[in-house]
């Protein structure tokens, strides 16, 4: 099950005490700042969580799965996420607990 922006705003409402409008604006602003930084080619480092980076991928050969025809996959920039050590440890501990 995925965590949505609406659920994040609801958590802020419940746990931090922001009203619902403020919580939604906070979540939207957070993602806007992340998006803007990445659009400017900057790395985003969230201490204790992980890093968002831009990675350049070169053009490469691909294949149309329906026809088998070779087609070029164009060069592009992709966003990658590398989890931080603390996040890895917490996820591994949760996964190991059998939940």
UniProtKB/Swiss-Prot annotation:
SUPFAM superfamilies: IHF-like DNA-binding proteins. SMART domains: BHL. The keyword Transcription applies. Gene3D superfamilies: IHF-like DNA-binding proteins. The keyword Transcription regulation applies. One of its GO terms (cellular component) is cytosol. GO terms for molecular function: DNA binding; structural constituent of chromatin. It holds the Pfam family Bac_DNA_binding. It comes from the Bacteria. Keywords: DNA recombination, DNA-binding, Transcription, Transcription regulation, Translation regulation. Signal peptide: none annotated. One of its GO terms (biological process) is regulation of DNA-templated transcription. PROSITE patterns: HISTONE_LIKE. Belongs to the bacterial histone-like protein family. This protein is one of the two subunits of integration host factor, a specific DNA-binding protein that functions in genetic recombination as well as in transcriptional and translational control. NCBIfam families: himA (TIGR00987), PRK00285.1 (NF001401). Heterodimer of an alpha and a beta chain. HAMAP family: IHF_alpha. This is Integration host factor subunit alpha. The gene is ihfA.
